[in-house]
Amino acid sequence: MQDTGSVVPLHWFGFGYAALVASGGIIGYAKAGSVPSLAAGLLFGSLASLGAYQLSQDPRNVWVFLATSGTLAGIMGMRFYHSGKFMPAGLIAGASLLMVAKVGVSMFNRPH
């Protein structure tokens, strides 16, 4: 068995992140009746799940996951910057930024 360098495979973090994003959209809809929050949460959660699945099949196939988390980091980062509210924009922006960093580090640490 080859050592991947990580105790927990990257795709498990990806599935957890996808669940966080999707549940954020569902909670936004439940609390405020926000259909755009529900739609965006489910869309980005589904894309993150697809990206995590692709990572589980081929650890080099990072592009869907990286694009999804990078886009969310940018969008929610701007929302957090303008609103100053940690929930939900700051939380999702921070989690997205962490996922971009984790995927980026894993890209540079893997053998070519």
From Swiss-Prot:
Required for normal heme biosynthesis. PANTHER family: TRANSMEMBRANE PROTEIN 14, 15, TRANSMEMBRANE PROTEIN 14C-RELATED. It comes from Pongo abelii (Sumatran orangutan). InterPro entries: TMEM14 (IPR005349), TMEM14_sf (IPR044890). Keywords: Heme biosynthesis, Membrane, Mitochondrion, Transmembrane, Transmembrane helix. It is a multi-pass membrane protein. Belongs to the TMEM14 family. Its main location: mitochondrion. This is Transmembrane protein 14C. Pfam families: Tmemb_14 (PF03647). GO terms for biological process: erythrocyte differentiation; heme biosynthetic process; mitochondrial transport; regulation of heme biosynthetic process.
